[in-house]
């Protein structure tokens, strides 16, 4: 059983970054909206909890609250920004609006020996409009800054800690070490979340679910669908049939490259469908991006259903959905967070879907998908040069985007 950390999301746009930083430590974690039913979160059997930041104030009516099971569990807790305020507020501390909002670089002074932070001055990234004025019983001040009397607090005997700053962003140089101390030393989570363990777990789950039934894989030629197809093929072999849809929007020679790659490198039975007329006909005259995504998603599914009827009984459809696809497609009411966009794998699925979905990458970030694809345990290499080049560009862009995201002006409480 993989040791895990549960991250409760209180509406922060940094929450995915927290999860990525924890997984970079080879510790598995999952993100849950703060109001997720307790049994769903506790089924993860976490070794500890991280409470994200958020745009609310704990003293406002309707602000997200701390679920009772978090403190009742006796497990370690790390509150970040709003998460620290919420833990303090729930335990009898006092949180008030600050005279001035603080956004940007700051220097804290760690004044007390503790398990979380080394002594001395440290650069951090602040983003808050409230501050903690009175500590809850049992807590002490671990760090201060000129404008923040409680930059970090802790109750070591209860293994509860809070920080006003954001350790997850790269502007806090010591943030990775802080998260490592919390996840591995305080929570004692074993760093076992590796590409090989991901593959082993996925293959076991796919075999158990599919049994002797047949599976269609939606192949786009990109990295996500390639890795998803390779994982399922490793699990069930010839029970898998890949379907590549030529929708008329491909790169030059992409169809030929995909056909060659999947036949030669993966040994997957691949069917190529010429659906250019259907896709372009449905997209003709449509300018709204969300409507386009829905049209593309539904047209893909209808195309797969038509191929399944030709092939006989098909029970499952494989998609290369990854974790950001799911999070970014969340509705605007989720944690009061703004919907970014719907992904055609998620928001575009019709309600009368004829297949059960298999999404082996659903809980993986893009960098984890890349690492799985490079593992010797999966027969995906050599990745076709065309896909590898395309992936390299995407990987670099996503890396740049991740750094930019951690710099976005987003004042939390």
Positions of predicted regions on the chain:
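Catalytic metal-binding/acid-base residues of hydrolase active sites
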Residues: 83, 168, 322-323
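RNA-binding accessory domains that recognize and position tRNA/RNA substrates
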Residues: 1-48, 55-59, 65, 71-73, ...
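Gly/Ala-rich beta-loop-alpha elbow adjacent to hydrolase catalytic centers
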Residues: 79, 83, 88
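Short glycine-rich anion-binding loops that position phosphate/pyrophosphate groups of nucleotides
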Residues: 53-57, 322-325
């Amino acid at each position: 059983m993989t040791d895990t950390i549960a991250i409760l999301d209180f509406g922060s746009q940094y929450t995915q970054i927290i999860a990525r930083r924890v997984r970079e430590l080879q510790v598995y974690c999952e993100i849950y909206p703060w109001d997720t039913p307790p049994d769903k979160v506790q089924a993860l059997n976490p070794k500890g909890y991280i409470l994200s930041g958020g745009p609310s104030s704990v003293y406002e009516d309707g602000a997200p609250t701390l679920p009772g099971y978090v403190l009742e569990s006796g497990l370690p807790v790390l509150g970040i920004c709003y998460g620290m305020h919420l833990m303090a507020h729930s335990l009898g501390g006092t949180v008030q609006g600050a005279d001035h909002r603080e956004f940007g670089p700051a220097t804290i002074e760690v004044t007390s020996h503790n398990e979380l932070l080394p002594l001395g001055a440290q650069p951090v990234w602040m983003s808050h409009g409230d501050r903690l004025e009175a500590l809850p019983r049992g807590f002490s001040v671990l760090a201060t800054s000129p404008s923040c009397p409680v930059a970090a607090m802790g109750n070591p005997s209860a293994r509860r800690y809070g920080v006003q700053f954001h350790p997850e962003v790269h502007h806090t140089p010591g943030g990775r070490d802080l998260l490592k101390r919390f996840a591995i030393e305080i929570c004692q989570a074993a760093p076992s979340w590796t590409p090989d363990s991901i593959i082993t777990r996925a293959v076991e789950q796919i075999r158990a679910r599919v049994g002797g039934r047949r599976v269609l894989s939606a192949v786009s030629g990109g990295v996500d669908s390639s890795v998803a197809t390779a994982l399922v093929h490793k699990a069930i072999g010839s029970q898998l049939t890949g379907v590549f849809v030529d929708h008329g929007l491909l790169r030059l020679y992409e169809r030929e490259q995909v056909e060659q790659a999947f036949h030669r490198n993966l040994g997957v039975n691949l069917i190529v469908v010429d659906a250019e007329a259907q896709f372009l006909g449905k997209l003709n005259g449509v300018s709204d991006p969300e409507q386009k995504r829905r049209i593309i998603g539904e047209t893909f599914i209808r195309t797969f259903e038509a191929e399944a009827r030709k092939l006989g009984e098909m029970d499952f459809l494989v998609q290369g959905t990854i974790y950001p696809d799911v999070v970014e497609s969340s509705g605007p009411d989720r944690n009061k967070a703004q919907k970014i966009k719907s992904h055609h794998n998620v928001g575009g699925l019709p309600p009368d879907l004829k297949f059960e979905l298999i999404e082996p990458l659903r809980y993986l970030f893009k960098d984890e998908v890349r690492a799985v694809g490079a593992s010797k345990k999966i027969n995906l290499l050599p990745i076709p040069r065309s896909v590898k080049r395309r992936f390299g560009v995407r990987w670099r862009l996503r890396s740049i985007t991740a750094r930019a995201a951690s710099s976005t002006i987003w004042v939390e409480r």
